[in-house]
């Protein structure tokens, strides 16, 4: 059986699944001696991520298909390499969350954290909470007029330790803020949350927004991030300090019907990007290489 060869710079859950298929061969990064004594193998499919360096350009120009995770990345590659649209495909990051009834999970989390179950939960987490806008997140939450809400920030021990020094600047959040260090089941926090805000300065596609949508959260994210391609105008922040976001959040929290409708719409949209659906998309591409 002829195998389809793939190469990637960074592994993700979709690639992990592909590697287990019998029709796939993964080309490994060449060591120093291989670079000197053997010709470089060009993959059939190249999964591009990160900077567009010379090696990346070579793979893009010579592979049959390049996969990227946003149209912004696709457009940049086309502009800088002049390859045709036919040689590049967009597959958004995959969602792999064990979906459970958000209402049941919220009851569980509220009991665990001693929160009133009627409170709205506004959630924030990121790999790098500083560059993802944790200060701006706190600024937004402290500007809300709506009263019955709790704020949860989850991060690793070092992130939360450093963040604690900033908390005294937000006295009106003193009784509303919960900081969680190295929380084991982050997915359950997404399921329990009502709103997920990411005032990030990072451009790279935030898969946490897709995860939050899948878990029926109302989301807000800056237009600097490539995930803007899948959210609507209401969810878009002009900048990390967009002054209109607090007003939007107040408005949506006061309209239960609109609030629930957005949560439902977000989940329906995010279902397209489950790992199972993305696996179907990439295998369709493989079949037609």
Identify what each model region corresponds to.
Residues 64-88, 95-99:
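A short, active-site helix/loop in glycosyltransferases that binds the activated sugar's phosphate group
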Residues 120, 127-143:
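A conserved mid-protein helix/loop that constitutes part of the nucleotide-sugar donor-binding site
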Residues 125, 150-163:
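Glycosyltransferase donor-sugar binding loop
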Residues 164-182:
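Nucleotide-activated donor-binding/catalytic signature segment of Leloir-type glycosyltransferases, i.e.
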Residues 201:
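Aromatic "clamp/platform" in nucleotide-sugar-dependent glycosyltransferases that forms part
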Residues 218-221:
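Short hydrophobic beta-strand element within catalytic cores of glycosyltransferases
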Residues 233-243, 251-257:
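Conserved acidic donor-binding segment of nucleotide-sugar-dependent glycosyltransferases
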Residues 254-288:
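A charged, aromatic-enriched C-terminal amphipathic alpha-helix characteristic of glycosyltransferases
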């Amino acid at each position: 059986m002829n195998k389809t060869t793939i190469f990637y710079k960074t592994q993700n859950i979709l690639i992990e699944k592909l590697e287990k298929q019998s029709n796939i061969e993964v080309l490994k990064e060449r060591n120093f001696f291989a670079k000197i004594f053997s010709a470089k193998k060009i993959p059939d499919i190249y999964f591009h991520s990160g900077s567009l360096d010379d090696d990346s350009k070579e793979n893009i120009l010579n592979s049959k298909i390049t996969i990227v995770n946003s149209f912004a990345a696709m457009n940049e590659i086309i502009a800088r390499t002049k390859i045709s649209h036919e040689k590049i495909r967009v597959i958004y990051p995959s969602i792999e969350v064990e979906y459970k009834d958000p209402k049941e999970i919220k009851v569980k989390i509220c009991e665990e954290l001693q929160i009133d179950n009627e409170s709205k939960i506004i959630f924030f987490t990121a790999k790098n909470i500083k560059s993802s806008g944790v200060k701006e997140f706190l600024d937004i939450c402290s500007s809300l007029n709506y009263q019955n809400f709790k704020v949860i920030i989850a991060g690793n021990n070092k992130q939360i330790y450093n963040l604690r020094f900033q908390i005294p600047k937000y006295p009106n959040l003193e009784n509303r803020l919960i900081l969680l260090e190295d929380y084991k089941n982050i997915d359950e926090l997404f399921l329990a949350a009502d709103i997920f805000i990411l005032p990030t300065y990072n451009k790279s596609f935030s898969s946490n927004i897709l995860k939050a949508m899948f878990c029926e959260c109302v989301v807000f994210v800056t237009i600097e991030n490539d995930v803007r391609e899948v959210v609507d105008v209401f969810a878009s922040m002009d900048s990390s300090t967009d002054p209109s976001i607090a007003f939007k959040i107040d408005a949506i929290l006061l309209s239960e019907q609109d609030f629930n409708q957005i949560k439902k719409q977000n989940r329906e949209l995010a279902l397209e990007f489950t790992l199972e659906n993305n696996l179907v998309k990439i295998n369709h591409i493989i079949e037609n290489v």
